[in-house]
Amino acid sequence: MEPSPDVPLEEITWHSPQHVQMMGGFLHSNNILFYFAESPFFDPTSNNASLALQAMHNENLRPFIETRGAFEGRLKTMQGLEFIVAHDPLLEAAAANAAAVARGEQPKEASNVWVIRKQMRRRSAAMGGQDDVQVLATYFVVGDSVFMAPSVWSVVGRRMLSTVTSLTKVLSTASALLTFSPSYGHSYLPHVPKSLEPTQLGQQSAQQSKETTPMPDMSGDKTTSRSALADASTTTLNASALQDARDFAETLNLLARYGNEYIDETPLAGEPGSFIFTKASASAAEQLSVAGAGAQASRQNIRSGATTPVPFGAGRPASVQPDSTKGKAADRPPAATKDKGKKRKSKIGSMSQ
């Protein structure tokens, strides 16, 4: 039975109950290699096939195929590709049972798992007449099913392929979630602005409430609408709490940076590009001392009943009339004089008539 060239041998499981029935109904040490020779894992150009074919046509070689010990002993005298049994469960069980009986224990049942190796044998004169054996593959026979053991390269390669495939899927999924902004940089979470104006915040909350407002349920089922309203309120509260936390952190940052700075006592005057310093009339300490003295004097005047005027600048400003206004008021005639002149003119007019 030849395997398909497109299917790897590591993915094939072969069994043949017909051959098991032809070989006595069960597998043992003397027929396991001949049962394996019927599988697609067997190489017809190996020394096993050559020795079996010679024994069928040469009676002198027939004893070599009657037992597995004689067959493998003959293979060791040949060079080339061969298949041998590396693990015999029947022999192992027999040795274990003999030891158990010697210890007075109950014997155990055999595992019925065979291990067959494919190897290349070469003569080596440099090794003192010993053979150079290179293992090419390993096979397992469990019951009547034959499996090929995967190589180390195959196992590591498949594990690496699985790891790389999983990482590729994760990166492709995460790349769609990555966002970038000049303020926050790269992030996988949605950005929330640091500060929003009250009007914008009100408009945003109104838009969110409009978008999340459920339509009237004509069937009378209000469970869906209540859950939608609860979700909308929870989302709004979470956004508000996050914004408050950001504002508080920004306030602490500004306090730490500019908490020890104050506005200059000497103000600036002018336009941008031509600012000049204006001389203050009095420093803050002097203004405070003058204000304190004025307040104390006013309290003393109230107690004594005197009409001493409050110093200018300490209390309310005094209404002082300028000198120019005084001169004009002195030159102006009184109102009574104007009235008398008018009466005299009226009398003179009546007499002339």
Curated annotation (Swiss-Prot):
Q: What's the gene?
A: MED6
Q: Where is the composition biased (Polar residues)?
A: 197-212, 297-307
Q: What is a biological process (GO) this protein takes part in?
A: regulation of transcription by RNA polymerase II
Q: Which InterPro entries match?
A: Mediator_Med6 (IPR007018), Mediator_Med6_sf (IPR038566)
Role: Component of the Mediator complex, a coactivator involved in the regulated transcription of nearly all RNA polymerase II-dependent genes. Mediator functions as a bridge to convey information from gene-specific regulatory proteins to the basal RNA polymerase II transcription machinery. Mediator is recruited to promoters by direct interactions with regulatory proteins and serves as a scaffold for the assembly of a functional preinitiation complex with RNA polymerase II and the general transcription factors.
Q: Which UniProt keywords apply?
A: Activator, Nucleus, Transcription, Transcription regulation
Q: Which domain of life is it from?
A: Eukaryota
Q: Where is the signal peptide?
A: none
Q: Which family does it belong to?
A: Belongs to the Mediator complex subunit 6 family.
Name of a matching Pfam family: Med6
What subcellular locations does the record give?
Nucleus
Region (Disordered), start-end ranges: 193-231, 296-353
Is DNA damage set as a keyword in this record?
no
**Name of the protein:** Mediator of RNA polymerase II transcription subunit 6
Provide the assembly information: Component of the Mediator complex.
Q: Which GO terms describe its cellular component?
A: mediator complex
Q: Which organism is it from?
A: Coccidioides immitis (strain RS) (Valley fever fungus)
Q: Does the keyword Transferase apply?
A: no
GO MF annotation terms: transcription coregulator activity
